[in-house]
């Protein structure tokens, strides 16, 4: 631990020094001295020095308008560099004496444990190879870093790795340090903030870039190591076509609350994915054609290429021509609709078969060592990513489908669909689903919103099945929500089954999820329209915003239990799709622990989850880090499948029922029932300003109104910026305190010790409370909140203190995260750079609100940079 601390601090010190050189060169030594004075004041203030805190405060207050932006930029860059150093620490080269990191050990150790539990080698190999883990990449307004800078940060991490070699001479060390200096200067002189909002297509390209630069390399590497672990434990290998983890995307498909995602955008993103996939395979195949110059070939390969002197090259050149044709067609189709020429690859077998033919031939001819190199990597990519790179999900709000159905029934003279009761809707929808004639005449001219819904359904019908994932219905609450989408898709020409997935988001809808699915599975003809298992999406963000995380977490758990039970009774396979965010307030947290805390039977070899915004970059932005996280997913889903936790004891259920009631009452008493709350929220946080920032393609609000109209992400993002972290803990302080007052501390201790669900919740709560900071939140109140609302802020800080104390009582520690000194070290390291940014942001908000500033004024730009810096410093922001 001390070794990691020392090395981390050494790297941070070096990067900070090089950034200081860059700043001095541009703005002079006097300006750098100001930055240092602010930093040292923050550091001393954190150690309890009143003098240091005063030095920090007076230094920030004394900044002129022209200094606000460069100071904000300096601390933003410090935090990004600290993040790079921390990420590098997670994957740095270790010598033989150091134990492997948990992420590298987790699968081999699990396989040994499963073997000891009595699972046969065959069963283990079979289960591992047929796992279906779907990671769904989504764009979110909290990913504030520009792609240009991300690439520079990756290059900085590579130079830190180069510095880690112990056999460097002084010349080599100087060269690497010079490269680092140059990269840091490039980052400093690159504007870190987008001036214009990204389009949905920009967001999709960002997602493709993560695949190109990281996941493309991580996938074959993690599979190679998984295969090695399996072979070491069982003597068996992973089948060549095993792809336990695949990727889907919402970028370009998620139109819920985002009018910028149109049918045309979805079509463009599907074509771009196809273009990108062909381009990436072309690079692989070019390299393979250069390497595979051998003459010896199997009879099967000879039958394919004839008596060519270079049979492998001949086979690969044919594949290369087809990949070029596919790439050219996809590119040309972006500007006009073109029929696909014969040479275009349509089915993944057309990509896989030539590669397999070469692979098998090499093995047959005694050249297995060659086959198991880059050719095997390419094969595994082809199985994982296919011709379409990612499967695109489509998501739309149930109210949009209801409005479209209402316009249709109105036009047909059948009455208003939105006014019908549920049974009338179901009867009508089933009748039309089973009717062979079209519902609408070809000359039907709908209003713009309905036309867009139908155009999206036509794109879904026209797209290849393998390019699409699920059609997700947000704010679903009834069986008719699912049937309506099935009918709209049928009406648009879809002639194959497709996964139409209800997303249950509010507390009431989660409680009703079981009955809705039970109704659907009992309807005539419904199962024939299912594509694979019954998929159901559990919403974490809106349920937590609606009721607080105590009640939401328990409602999510109970809903999953009921769905498992219903699908087991109905003999239908179930796939649960977890709509998690990056923060605890939106269901985020360490994936490994979260998966192992799911109800027994809910992870039966299948797991689907969203990976969001900035978390994609932190978890999958670098190949080595991506590989570690893929290992964690693989091991957790395998363990949850073969070693599910026992069901909770009746006393624990009773306790959670009571705590959920106490939690939701306490949460809503503040958020819903206090008439001053919304005004306080708007004054104390940068919520209003966040709506103006060009952070993502989606508007921050669904409609005008109070907290309920806000999307879950800006709601969380705003509280994170001020360090109150309110949505992640509010309600827990009351729920846990009341349980202790009732004398149930022993039951709580038992739950934490024996029940993974409860232990994980408390661990995540502890993590977020360790990042919360009442002093920082008070600072925002003092600068920004009117005198008559100050008492509300003080009350919320008291509740935060209560939450911290009750968690410490439960864990038996004197300090939050005392059991994880490494995490505490990372938080402490960042606070030195975060404190000035918080102080600066409060000052900027105050100045901004007291004058009219244009969006590109230094004041607004500095505010943007402060938002980005705090987001970088706290990592999981929304």
UniProtKB/Swiss-Prot annotation:
One of its GO terms (cellular component) is cytosol. InterPro entries: PEP_COase (IPR021135), PEP_COase_bac/pln-type (IPR022805), PEP_COase_Lys_AS (IPR018129), PEPCASE_His_AS (IPR033129), Pyrv/PenolPyrv_kinase-like_dom (IPR015813). Its EC number is 4.1.1.31. The active site is at 140, 545. Pfam families: PEPcase (PF00311). GO terms for molecular function: magnesium ion binding; phosphoenolpyruvate carboxylase activity. It is an enzyme of class 4 (lyase). It comes from the Bacteria. Keywords: Carbon dioxide fixation, Lyase, Magnesium. It catalyses: oxaloacetate + phosphate = phosphoenolpyruvate + hydrogencarbonate. PROSITE patterns: PEPCASE_1, PEPCASE_2. The keyword Lyase applies. The keyword Lyase applies. One of its GO terms (biological process) is oxaloacetate metabolic process. Its cofactor is Mg(2+). Forms oxaloacetate, a four-carbon dicarboxylic acid source for the tricarboxylic acid cycle. HAMAP family: PEPcase_type1. Belongs to the PEPCase type 1 family. NCBIfam families: PRK00009.1 (NF000584). PANTHER family: PHOSPHOENOLPYRUVATE CARBOXYLASE (PTHR30523:SF6). This is Phosphoenolpyruvate carboxylase.
């Amino acid at each position: 631990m001390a070794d990691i601390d020392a090395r981390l601090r050494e790297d941070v010190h070096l990067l900070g020094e090089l950034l200081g050189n860059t700043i001095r060169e541009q703005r002079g030594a006097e300006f750098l001295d100001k930055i240092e004075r602010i930093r040292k004041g923050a550091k001393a203030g954190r150690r309890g020095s009143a003098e240091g805190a005063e030095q920090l405060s007076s230094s920030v207050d004394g900044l002129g308008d022209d200094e606000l932006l460069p100071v904000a930029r300096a601390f933003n860059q410090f935090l990004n560099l600290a993040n790079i150093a921390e990420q590098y620490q997670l994957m740095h080269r270790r010598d033989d004496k150091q134990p492997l990191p948990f992420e590298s050990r987790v699968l081999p150790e699990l396989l040994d444990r499963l073997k000891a539990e009595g699972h046969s080698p065959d069963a283990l190999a079979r289960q591992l190879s047929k796992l279906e883990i779907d990671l769904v990449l989504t764009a979110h307004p909290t990913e504030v870093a520009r792609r240009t800078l991300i690439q520079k940060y990756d290059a900085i991490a590579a130079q830190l790795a180069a510095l880690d070699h112990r056999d460097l001479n002084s010349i080599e060390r100087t060269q690497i340090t010079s490269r680092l200096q140059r990269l840091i200067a490039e980052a400093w002189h690159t504007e870190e903030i987008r001036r214009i909002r990204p389009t949905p297509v920009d967001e999709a390209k960002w997602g493709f870039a993560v695949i190109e630069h990281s996941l493309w390399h991580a996938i074959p590497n993690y599979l190679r190591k998984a295969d090695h672990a399996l072979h070491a434990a069982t003597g068996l290998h992973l089948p060549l076509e095993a792809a336990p983890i695949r990727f889907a995307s919402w970028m370009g498909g998620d139109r819920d609350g985002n009018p910028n995602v149109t049918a045309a955008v979805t079509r463009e993103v599907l074509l771009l994915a196809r273009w990108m996939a062909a381009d990436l395979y072309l690079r692989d195949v070019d390299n393979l054609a250069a390497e595979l110059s051998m003459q010896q070939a199997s009879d099967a390969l000879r039958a394919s290429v004839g008596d060519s002197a270079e049979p492998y090259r001949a086979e690969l050149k044919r594949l290369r021509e087809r990949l070029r044709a596919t790439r050219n067609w996809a590119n040309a189709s972006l500007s006009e609709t073109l029929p696909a020429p014969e040479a275009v690859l349509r089915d993944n077998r057309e990509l896989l078969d030539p590669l397999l033919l070469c692979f098998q031939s090499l093995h047959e001819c005694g050249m297995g060592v060659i086959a198991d190199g880059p050719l095997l990597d390419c094969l595994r990519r082809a199985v994982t990513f296919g011709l379409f790179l990612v499967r695109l999900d489509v998501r739309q709000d149930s109210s949009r489908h209801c409005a479209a159905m209402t316009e249709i029934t109105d036009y047909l003279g059948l009455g208003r669909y939105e006014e019908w009761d549920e049974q009338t809707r179901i009867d009508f929808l089933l009748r039309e689903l089973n009717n062979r004639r079209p519902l609408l005449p070809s000359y039907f001219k709908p209003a713009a919103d309905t036309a867009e819904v139908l155009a999206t359904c036509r794109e879904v019908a026209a797209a290849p099945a393998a390019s699409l994932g699920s059609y997700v219905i947000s704010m679903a609450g009834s069986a008719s929500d699912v049937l309506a989408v099935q009918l709209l898709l049928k009406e648009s020409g879809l002639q194959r089954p497709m996964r139409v997935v209800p997303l249950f988001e509010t507390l009431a809808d989660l409680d009703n999820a079981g009955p809705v699915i039970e109704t659907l599975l009992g309807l005539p003809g419904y199962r024939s329209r299912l594509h694979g298992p019954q998929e159901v999406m559990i919403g974490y963000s809106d349920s937590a915003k609606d009721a607080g995380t105590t009640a939401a977490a328990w409602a999510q758990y109970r809903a999953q239990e009921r769905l498992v039970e219903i699908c087991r009774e109905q003999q239908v396979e179930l796939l649960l799709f977890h709509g998690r965010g990056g923060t605890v307030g939106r269901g985020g947290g360490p994936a490994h622990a979260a998966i192992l805390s799911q109800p027994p039977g809910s992870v039966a070899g299948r797991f689907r989850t969203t990976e969001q915004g900035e978390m994609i970059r932190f978890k999958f932005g670098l190949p080595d880090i991506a590989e570690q996280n893929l290992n964690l997913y693989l091991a957790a889903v395998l363990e949850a499948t073969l070693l599910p936790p026992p069901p909770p004891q009746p006393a624990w259920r009773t306790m959670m029922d009571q705590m959920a009631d106490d939690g939701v009452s306490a949460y809503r008493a503040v958020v819903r029932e206090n008439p001053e709350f919304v005004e306080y929220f708007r004054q104390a946080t940068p919520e209003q300003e966040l709506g103006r920032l060009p952070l993502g393609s989606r508007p921050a609000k669904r409609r005008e109104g109070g907290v309920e109209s806000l999307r879950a992400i800006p709601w969380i993002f705003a509280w994170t910026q001020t360090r109150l972290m309110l949505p992640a803990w509010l309600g827990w302080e009351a729920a846990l305190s009341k349980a202790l007052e009732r004398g149930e501390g022993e039951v709580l201790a038992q739950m934490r010790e024996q029940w993974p669900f409860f232990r994980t919740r408390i661990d995540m709560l502890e993590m977020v409370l360790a990042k919360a900071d009442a002093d920082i939140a008070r600072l925002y109140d003092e600068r920004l909140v009117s005198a008559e609302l100050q008492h509300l802020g003080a009350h919320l800080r008291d509740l935060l203190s209560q939450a911290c104390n009750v968690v410490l009582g439960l864990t038996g520690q004197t300090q939050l995260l005392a059991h994880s000194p490494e995490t505490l070290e990372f938080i402490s390291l960042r606070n030195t750079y975060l404190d000035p940014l918080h102080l600066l942001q409060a000052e900027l908000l105050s100045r901004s609100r007291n004058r009219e500033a244009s969006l590109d004024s230094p004041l607004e730009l500095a505010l943007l940079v402060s938002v980005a810096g705090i987001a970088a410093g706290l990592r999981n922001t929304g």
